[in-house]
Design a protein with these regions (language model features):
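Transmembrane beta-strands of outer-membrane beta-barrel proteins
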Residues: 167-169, 195-199, 253-255, 355, ...
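Outer-membrane beta-barrel channels and translocator barrels
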Residues: 65, 190-192, 202, 246-250, ...
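Acidic, small-polar-rich N-terminal luminal/periplasmic segments of exported/outer-membrane proteins
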Residues: 29-164, 573
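Structural signature of Gram-negative outer-membrane beta-barrels, strongest in the C-terminal barrel
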Residues: 244-248, 408-409, 420-424, 454-574
């Protein structure tokens, strides 16, 4: 997949302002040693027998990274898979990925933010701001992190409230009318209560110039005049608030909330529109660029426009063009010719609340986290990418999830241990369809639209020990059992479409296909590894088993089906 990178920092102006404690922004070596929590405890990255790429907040700032997807440029063995010009993206770690980008499908690479799992694959693309560090763990991580981490995971840890007052503000101005502001402030609010408030806004102007006539395409009920809009713009806002409460000398309670809102234009690619030229007998004798057609129609016969827009002969092969007589734009410059170009077709909104309790008892540490997230997404695009907007794809999704984790940990002279319980609930409502007939490819007419609901409940118990066989040799063993229940309802409705730009799902009509099904699964993950320390080096070899829960497919035009769990066993030494 090719990602459009505008090198925002080329013309960037950055202002960093310390509200207090100038030492917070003192020059440091950004490649210093990093502490990670890959094994649910704070450890130096060089002491962990896992393939990890980690970034501190200072490193992220020095590299100019502003989005989670930009991490792949600096992480070996990690890439992105996706579609719609990069607007739907899934992490690929060591080749473990999937090609189902529907919002109800969870990815085999798990993504966490501050200990909270992101169930939606589309939530994996988010802006980076006020981040303490990011850890990318490669290989199965099912023992401690659970389901759907067969390929690995991306763990983002944000900056936390501080006792001393500190903060920063950054402003960036860059090419294509990009203006980005990021800032945070942290400090003590009252005795034993600390707060941190951070956020950012990014306004990105249109990168692609659309030479199609403004307003030439019909209106849409999504609220925008069609045609002519320049493309690949971005409007993102995000905010995070955290309150940290001291609970005596042994514990703390962290309450946090987050909100984000993103608006993007639709996928940028489309072939160059053409107009066919016919002689008096109706034979196609030429094809010209639509931009050179003064009559603004698909077909000109004997000098007269005989067909309006999108009504010409769909099959008119021409030298250098495709079967429909259209031409590839060749990707030269920043120009496109798109009739279906609306400025607000892709919207993503998310919000979340979390409460995290840490408490140190005399013989063990206790951790509890309650986490709620809500994710909404709307997508619209001309899916066929031809000169005529014949197959307008749209999807809408709402995902609500709640997770609860209880974890216990401790250590003695020869043993480190961690164990716990985990619960996850996900409710997904998802619809998708084509605003145009999938059989005749005519605008309007009958269309098939899919409407599905998926409810997931997952329960697990897990544990892992690190036992010192000698001063230099450690045996690591872990096991996780997961019970997962899924309830699925899917319907395909065929509706008479009166608007060729918007899908219309009428649930009062008879469903062409219905599937009501449930699936219960018993899953297990495991880890067995030996670690040997020599001087400042750590050598390890082991076996890891990860699982991704089975679920239900919901293709665009129906054909619902259950797919089995995925199992991955990895043998690794390093």
């Amino acid at each position: 997949m090719h990602t459009l990178n505008t090198h925002k920092r080329l013309l960037a102006l950055t202002v960093a302002m310390a509200l207090s404690t100038p030492a917070a922004f003192a020059a440091e070596n950004v490649w210093e040693s990093i502490e990670v929590t890959a094994q649910k405890r704070n450890e130096n990255i060089s002491d962990v027998g896992i393939a990890i790429t980690a970034f501190s907040g200072e490193q992220l700032e020095a590299l100019g990274l502003e989005s989670s997807t930009e991490l792949i440029a600096f992480t070996p063995g990690v890439s992105l898979a996706g579609d719609i010009g990069g607007q739907r993206a899934i992490f690929n770690i060591r080749g473990v990925v999937q090609n189902d980008y529907a919002d109800l499908a969870e990815a085999p690479v798990a993504v966490y933010v501050d200990g909270g799992y992101l169930a939606s694959t589309q939530a994996q693309t988010f802006g980076l701001f006020d981040v303490a560090r990011i850890e990318i763990l490669k290989g199965p991580q099912g023992t401690l992190f659970g389901r759907n981490a067969t390929g690995g995971l991306v763990n983002t840890i944000t900056a936390k409230p501080t006792a001393d007052t500190e903060g920063y503000a950054e402003f960036t101005a860059a090419r294509f009318e990009q203006y980005r502001f990021e800032g945070a402030i942290s400090g003590e609010i009252a005795d034993g209560i600390y707060g941190r408030f951070s956020g950012f806004t990014n306004q990105q102007g249109e990168i692609l110039e659309n030479i199609y006539e403004d307003g030439a395409a019909p209106d849409t009920r999504l609220g925008s005049v069609g045609g002519g809009e320049d493309g690949y713009n971005d409007d993102t806002k995000a905010f995070r608030a955290q309150l940290l409460f001291d609970i005596g000398e042994e514990g703390s309670l962290l309450l946090s909330g987050n909100w984000s809102d993103t608006t993007k234009s639709e996928g940028p690619y489309q072939v160059v529109n053409t107009t066919e030229i016919k002689d008096a007998d109706g034979n196609v004798i030429d094809v010209i660029y639509a931009a050179d057609d003064p009559l603004g129609c698909d077909t000109i016969q004997a000098g007269v426009c005989v067909d309006g827009n999108f009504n010409g002969d769909p099959f008119r092969p021409v030298q250098g063009g495709d079967f429909n007589g259209n031409f590839d734009p060749d990707g030269s410059g920043n120009k496109v010719n798109k009739d279906f170009a609306f400025d607000d077709q892709n919207k993503i909104k998310s919000k979340g609340l979390a409460a995290t309790l840490d408490y140190a008892f005399e013989s063990f540490d206790f951790f509890a986290m309650s986490d709620y997230k809500e994710f909404k997404r709307t997508v619209g695009l001309d899916s066929d990418q031809t000169a005529s907007p014949e197959l307008i794809f749209q999807s809408n999704s709402t995902i609500e999830q709640f997770s609860q984790e209880f974890r216990f940990s401790g250590e003695s002279a020869d043993l480190k241990w961690v164990g716990g319980l985990y619960y996850l609930s996900i409710d997904t409502d998802y619809s998708q369809g084509l605003a145009g007939s999938p059989t005749t490819f005519f605008l309007g007419g009958e269309e098939n639209n899919t409407l599905v609901s998926l409810e997931t409940e997952s329960y697990s118990v897990f544990g892992q020990i690190d036992y010192s066989l000698s001063d230099d040799l450690v045996l690591v063993g872990g096991l996780r059992y997961t019970r997962e229940d899924k309830d699925f309802v899917g319907n395909v409705y065929q509706n008479e479409n009166t608007n060729d730009r918007v899908i219309e799902i009428d649930t009062t009509t008879t469903s062409l296909e219905t599937l009501v099904d449930s699936n219960d699964q018993n899953l297990w993950s495991a880890k067995l590894q030996l670690e040997y320390s020599v001087g400042n080096s750590l050598y390890y070899a082991g076996i890891n088993r990860g699982v991704k829960a089975g679920s239900f497919n919901a293709p665009l035009q129906g054909g619902f089906s259950l797919y089995e769990p995925e199992e991955l066993t990895a043998y690794e030494a390093g």
